[in-house]
Amino acid sequence: MAPPVLRPENALKRADELISVGEPQAALQSLLDYITSRRIRFADPAAIEPIVFKFLELGVELKRGKVIKDGLYQYRKHVQSSTEGLKSVGAVSRRFIDLIEKKMSSEQAKANAEESTEEDLEGGVTPENLLISVYEQDQSVGGFNDEAVTSWLRFTWESYRTVLDLLRNNSQLEITYSGVVNRAMQFCLKYNRKNEFKRLADMLRQHLDAANYQQQKSKQYTVDLSDPDTLQRYLDQRILQVNVSVKLGLWHEAFRSIEDVHHLLSMSTRDPKPSVLANYYQNMAKVFFVSSNYLLNSVALQKFYDLYQQNPKATDEDFKFYASQLVLSALSIQQDDLPVVGYDPLARLAGFLNLESKPTRSQVIEAVSDSKIFSRADEPVKKLYELLNSDFDVNTLKESLASLLPELNSKSYFTQYVEPLKSFTIRKAFISASKQFGSIKLDELFEHTSLPSPFDLSPLDLEKSLLQAAMNDYVSFSIDHDAGVVSFMEDPFELLGGSTATNADDEQRNDDGYEETHVEEEPEPILTRNSAVRTQLIELAKALKETEGFPHASYVDKVRMARNELIRQNNAIIASEKEAAEERARQLEYEKQSASGVPLTAEQVVEERQRRMKEEKEAAEARMEAEARRRAEEKRERELAAINEKTMLKMIEDINAKGLIFIDPKEAKNMTLEKFKKLTVELVSKDKKDLDERMSHAFKRVDHIERAYRKLEAPLWEKDAQKQKERDLESYNKLKQMMVEKAKKDHEENLRIHDRLVKIYPSYLHFREKVIAAQKSQIEALRAENAAKLEAAKNARLQEVRQQRYNELIARRKEELAAKEHDDRQRMLQDRLTKERKERERVNKEKDEAARKQREIEEAVERTIKRNVSATPAPPVRSAPPARAAPPPRASNEQVASPAPQPEKKLTYAEKMKLRRAGRA
């Protein structure tokens, strides 16, 4: 059967006719019917594209998102079977996005123009027009007419979602999909659409997960994530996603995007551009800074600085800014964390920066102190670095910072690091005070650690910082609040000794009392949790005191050594328990093997045989499954080889048809895509080499010919040059003579004019002063007149504005009074109509009541008549007619004739109804 004949121009003509008569909805529906019809499967997609473009223009103009979505999905369904159809889908999608962005820009410009229009002389949102906007339907005050823009924003966002879902996970539409993703992110950034950006990020993750899932299936046009170009596009999308997340302030979404980028970087074999990677590390540093992770913030800034050095447009001011920021970020890192047991979450975050382990503060400081970075930092930053990285004296710290902080406050990069630097400085001041003072008044301690602005803290905040330092095991102290004295301790086990003795005495007294009251009982010893911990700490203290260097170490070093020893002991306990468990498992296995040497019963033999048969059966089934998998794999390999051979043959024919190189088609069977690329490159390189050799020979030949020409032309050119030189010298001399003569004449004329003017110059000055004096009063009069006119114009304008506002107020009041009178008339009319309606209802009700009573009376009369009729057996005798002459007497045997029957009188309708009702009763 031949395909149907399509006339796309007729559909466009029909749509234009409907639009011209004011029926755009009908035009849109007609185009939708044409696009969704199955006939277009047989058409060339390029011929259908104008109809789809017209359909999109109408749909965007009418804001019919659902209709557009249905049309695009149906169009893709009909044309996706061919590569040309998918290209058409990409072109249609790009056109749709262009239309919606253009429309969104025009609507936004229109809204901005409406907001910028001044409503009165004051303009803007004033208290008066705010009150007016409450009761007026036309809320034209700026800031109240954003609903139209919001609806277009929602429509634009739904359009982006539709296009992304239309293009997702198709290898032929990857480039278009990537472009739409970038434009969608720019849309969210431009209009500050945070919620839409979150949904966009989730959608992109779902698309990537679907692409990963499709890798296991052999579908047509599946996205190949092993392709470097495809993977690079996904990576660029995620890096842009990180950038937009940071600009929008979506830090959680930025962190999730960083995870996506790290995953894609681990899969990629191609390094990103240094500029892109530098921007990525800069955004990562911002994310870590917001999360108060100053350690990784500094590492990320260091990686950014290393990449930024490759920027050819970077200036010395930029290097100074970023170097100073990097040094401050390193100084903001808190003291090196003490060893912890278990999983450290920072180890995973360090993996995002391609670090094998979590760095320490000392390592970061050492890297920052490199001359390339430190030498470019500002001088105040260098001084702060030298101050905080030395064992400063708490007594002189305040004076040093007082002269240094004002210089740093003027730097833009210093503000964001004030809080972490303050925390680090105060904590280090407490550590220094704990080393310098054994005990000190609380007020004196706060006086020593009170730093100048912006490092100043209240006494309550200082006490909180001191307690936080103790909780983190950087200092240990006891506070006597009665005396207001703080006592620092140099040994972390110092409090343990006193508390141990006290608790031991308490336990001894409790044990004595228990024995006195329960002499006959012998309870088992019970170790409480506190006593067990205390015992373990005492043993740890004894072991550490025997360690070299422990007695003379600082408090922090002692805590670090204690924690390392605890970690070592815990690891030893875990290893011993693991070894014991393995030993128990080996013992159980040995006992099982030993028990198997006992002679078995007949039942056990049968069970063993059945078990063996079951195992053999399972092994046979496993072999059969493995064989089936092997055959399926071989079949799949053969199919792939056939497809590869067909593809290679097609590519070889295409490359041979171009005529640049020739490849034997017989080699298609043993050729892969990589071999084809390599062979093509080799052949092209060989042809290029031959061409280069021929071109080089030709260039040499042309060079020799040119040399011969120039050798013959050289004497002629020399003669011509000598003649030209003589002609130029002659022309120069003539021109010089003319210029000298003209200059002399001009000079003489100027001297003559000067002599004439010098004679009349005093007269000119006298005349000038006379004219100025004469015109001065006139000028002042004109100025006064103009000032009066200006004042009169101002007053007239003010009066006009007041009169205009007064007229507007009078008109508004008249409108209000007219509206009120109209409402009163309407209300009176309504009341009158209500009264008339009630009166009619009352009259009708009375008539109904009278009719009911009349009906009851009639029914009673009818019942009475009926009873009377039933009580009388014969009808009443009618009166005889008037007497006539008596007839003659008849004989006795003569029969008397009976009178003729009288005709019955007809009953009326009312009488019939009465009789019928009486019969029913």
UniProtKB/Swiss-Prot annotation:
Where does this protein chiefly localize?
A: cytoplasm
Cellular component per GO? cytoplasmic stress granule; eukaryotic 43S preinitiation complex; eukaryotic 48S preinitiation complex; eukaryotic translation initiation factor 3 complex, eIF3e; eukaryotic translation initiation factor 3 complex, eIF3m; incipient cellular bud site; multi-eIF complex
- Region annotation Disordered: residue ranges? 497-524, 818-921
Q: Name one GO biological process term.
A: translation reinitiation
The alphabetized UniProt keywords are: Coiled coil, Cytoplasm, Initiation factor, Protein biosynthesis, RNA-binding
* Pro residues composition-biased segments: 873-890
Function comment: RNA-binding component of the eukaryotic translation initiation factor 3 (eIF-3) complex, which is involved in protein synthesis of a specialized repertoire of mRNAs and, together with other initiation factors, stimulates binding of mRNA and methionyl-tRNAi to the 40S ribosome. The eIF-3 complex specifically targets and initiates translation of a subset of mRNAs involved in cell proliferation.
Q: How does it assemble?
A: Component of the eukaryotic translation initiation factor 3 (eIF-3) complex.
Entry protein name: Eukaryotic translation initiation factor 3 subunit A
